[in-house]
UniProtKB/Swiss-Prot annotation:
Gene: CNGC2
Organism: Arabidopsis thaliana (Mouse-ear cress)
Family named by the database record: Belongs to the cyclic nucleotide-gated cation channel (TC 1.A.1.5) family.
Tissues where this protein is expressed: Expressed in the whole plant but only weakly in roots. Strongly expressed in the expanded cotyledons of 14-day-old seedlings and detected later in leaves after the transition to flowering. Also detected in flowers during organ senescence and in the dehiscence zone of siliques.
The protein's name in its UniProt record: Cyclic nucleotide-gated ion channel 2
Subunit-level organization: Homotetramer or heterotetramer (Potential). Binds calmodulin-1/4 with a higher affinity than calmodulin-2/3/5.
């Protein structure tokens, strides 16, 4: 007689062969109809209807992504649908012929084959991970179904049937979720081991191979079966009531702890394997740092929950031992540790009942019950003395929360507060708690510290930079004025950029993605600049791709008059003062508002033909009146844009806009307007005076001539700008 695993494998193989024959027969009939009765497509071939030619994605080398072992024509690559030109039109590939693609879907006996990289499978894996975490938290709740009754009569052991029923329903629902996961595993494509030798791995899409691979894997199907076996439910409803009637308390505790560890440890391993698979396929689990922080915190909480549950069960065993010892000392003791109803449903008991509704009255001589439930009594409880009021409490909240608190406190302090007795089981449990505390602190708390460090890394980086800067300024003995300027600039850059170099963050991204990100960040700001408001989207995309953010602190000089202009700066926030020397002692000042720009000498330098390599000098000094946020275009970037889109910069409207907002043109225009106004005023005054001339008027004429010379000097110093836009 074949073994049970071989029988299952044989059944899966026969079922897959039958389904494949049916699918192959249908596809052959469809091929006959499509090809007009071509006999070459018919026959007894039982191979799946799949092309032997590998798809384009499978033949590429580069990013380690999983590819299929065969080209699925029903799911053509997206790049093929988007390819086309004016000579080769794009064909409508989104509506395939149903007669040809309906029978090419990869289906098996368990349903359609799923791609592990799909969003659907990723969402299901996250939901399963949360369900497995809930299952880890539900299993220790079975321990709290056991309790010791405490009234004016004797103490007895019973099982809270109502609470056990609730926990059983929760556990069964979570096992049903895992059972659905097992069903999906029979449909989920896997990576072929042979394909990992050379290349980046290929997915196996054959339904029969997928089912066979999952069923034969010890860490696959059989491991999942062990995890979802309803062992705790069966033990609590079939075994525990019988053992309570037989008063085998030690055997009850031993069975509970062994069964718990038999399923709890595999569940932990299953969760770890699931998280590793999710990280291997997608590179992340939930995608944010805070989710990782929460997962580690939940794991630490579950570990405390498990430790508290084991502590609760072992405390019940010690109380039962105390009651037996007290009974043996009395001589005439007919003790029954079991209550009259070993399974008691407190939720449906009459409310008029004082205390517990199911207590035993089978004690002929009264045992001093408070002595065994008193932590200050003669019986030494060791580490279980704080559990005495918990195991006899009628409140489920107290029974669940206090052991969790004890577990958190014990694991966090490495069991420093534990004072065990000479009982060997108590000593072993204390050793396990110490080792568990060290292990959890090393793994989970260490991971939490890593996440917190990642969150606080930017702030810490800022603090280290400020400390190093202060040390350097102190070592170089910089004056307090310069130190204050450095501190002001560092604070402003931190407030504006958050301590991050935006260009460095997106530097390694693909060009298309980087361009889209910079367009999203800079497009609205660039549109506010009047010079770029009427340009094409293609030019704006190139400007956004080459724009760099800049920050300047108050009272800082952006550029001095006469210095080479290395970049064109566009002001987004703040005001800039422009100072230009017209002659000795004569300064022309103006203010640039948000939307203005400086360094327009580069624009004429880029458009000039023949081209000169020497950068143009700045015609003015620019000083920040406020904290400035801007973006800049370097000389090479601006030259690239003007060379490739010169047709746009020859536009008459753009020429007028550039001259209107240019600080150089505005200064030149202001000087010429003032000169013309003064000439007109002088001419009108001369007409009013007539021909009368006195010595006083002669002196005034000489003074006017000196002023006229200064005005002409200012006019000639303010040379008409050359923007080469004609």
């Amino acid at each position: 007689m074949p073994s049970h695993p071989n029988f299952i494998f044989r059944w899966i193989g026969l079922f897959s062969d039958k389904f494949r024959r049916q699918t192959t027969g249908i596809d052959e009939n469809s091929n006959l109809q499509i090809n007009g009765g071509d006999s070459s497509s018919s026959g007894s071939d039982e191979t799946p209807v799949l092309s032997s030619v590998e798809c384009y994605a499978c033949t590429q080398v580069g990013v380690p992504a999983f590819h299929s072992t065969s080209c699925d024509q029903a799911h053509a690559p997206e790049w093929r649908a988007s390819a086309g030109s004016s000579l080769v039109p794009i064909q409508e590939g989104s509506v395939p012929n149903p007669a040809r693609t309906r029978f090419r879907r990869l289906k098996g006996p368990f349903g359609e084959v799923l791609d592990p990289r799909s969003k659907r499978v990723q969402r299901w894996n996250r939901a399963l991970l949360l369900a497995r975490g809930m299952a880890l938290a539900v299993d220790p709740l079975f321990f709290y179904a056991l309790s010791i009754g405490r009234t004016t009569g004797p103490a007895c052991l019973y099982m809270d049937g109502a609470f056990a029923a609730v926990v059983t329903v929760l556990r069964t629902c979570l096992d049903a979720v895992h059972l659905w996961h097992v069903w999906l595993q029979f449909r989920l494509a896997y990576v072929s081991r042979e394909s990992l030798v050379v290349g980046c791995g290929k997915l196996v899409w054959d339904p029969r191979a997928i089912a066979s691979h999952y069923a034969r894997s010890l860490t696959g199907f059989w491991f999942d079966v062990i995890v979802i076996l309803p062992v705790p439910q069966a033990v609590f409803w079939l075994v525990v009531p019988k053992l309570i009637r037989e008063e085998k308390v030690k055997l009850i505790m031993t069975i509970l702890l062994l069964i718990f560890l038999f399923q709890f440890l595999p569940k932990i391993y299953h969760c770890i394997c699931l998280m590793r698979r999710m990280q291997k396929v997608t590179g992340y689990i939930f995608g944010t740092i805070w989710w990782g922080f929460a997962l580690n915190l939940i794991a630490y909480f579950i570990a405390s929950h498990v430790a508290g549950g084991c502590w609760y069960v072992l405390a019940i065993q010690r109380v039962a031992s105390c009651i037996r010892q007290q009974c043996m000392r009395t001589g005439n003791c007919n003790l029954s540790l079991a209550c009259k109803e070993e399974v008691c449903y407190q939720f449906v008991s009459p409310t008029s009942t004082v205390g517990y509704p199911c207590l035993s009255g089978n004690l002929t001589s009264v045992v001093n019950k408070p002595m065994c439930l008193d932590s200050n009594g003669p019986f030494r409880y060791g580490i279980y003395r704080w559990a005495l009021p918990v195991i006899s409490s009628n409140s489920l909240a107290v029974k669940i929360l206090y052991p969790i608190f004890w577990g958190l406190m014990t694991l966090s302090t490495f069991a420093n507060d534990l004072e065990p007795t000479s009982n060997w089981l108590e000593v072993i449990f204390s050793i396990v708690m110490v080792l568990s505390g060290l292990l959890l602190f090393t793994l989970l708390i260490g991971n939490i510290q890593v996440f917190l460090h990642a969150v606080m890394a930017k702030k810490r980086k800022m603090q280290i930079r400020c400390r190093d800067m202060e040390w350097w300024m102190k070592r170089r003995q910089l004056p307090s004025r310069l130190r204050q300027r450095v501190r002001r600039f560092e604070r402003q850059r931190w407030n504006a950029l958050g301590g991050e170099d935006e260009l460095e963050l997106i530097h390694d991204l693909p060009p298309g993605l980087r361009r889209d990100i910079k367009r999203y960040l800079c497009f609205d700001l660039i549109n506010k600049v009047p010079l770029f408001r009427g340009m094409d989207d293609l030019i704006l995309d190139n400007i956004c791709d080459r724009a760099k953010p800049r920050v300047f602190s108050k009272d800082e000089k952006i550029i001095r008059e006469g210095d080479p202009v290395q970049r064109m700066i566009f002001i987004m926030r703040g005001r800039v003062k422009r100072i230009q020397s017209l002659s000795k002692g004569v300064l022309a000042t103006s203010t640039l508002e948000p939307g203005g720009y400086l360094g327009d000498e580069l624009l004429s330098w880029c458009l000039r033909r023949p081209f000169l390599d020497r950068l143009p000098p700045s015609s003015a000094t620019f000083v920040c009146l406020e904290n400035i946020e801007a973006f800049s275009l370097g000389s090479e970037d601006l030259r690239y844009i003007t060379d490739h889109f010169r047709y746009k910069f020859a536009n008459e409207r753009l020429k007028r806009t550039a001259r209107y907002y240019s600080s150089n043109w505005r200064t030149w225009a202001a000087v010429n307007i003032q000169m013309a106004w003064r000439r007109r005023r002088k001419r009108t005054r001369g007409e009013n005076i007539g021909g009368s001339m006195s010595p006083v008027s002669e002196n005034s004429i000489e003074g006017n001539s000196e002023r006229r010379l200064l005005q002409y000097a200012a006019m000639f110093m303010s040379i008409r700008p050359h923007d080469h836009l004609e």
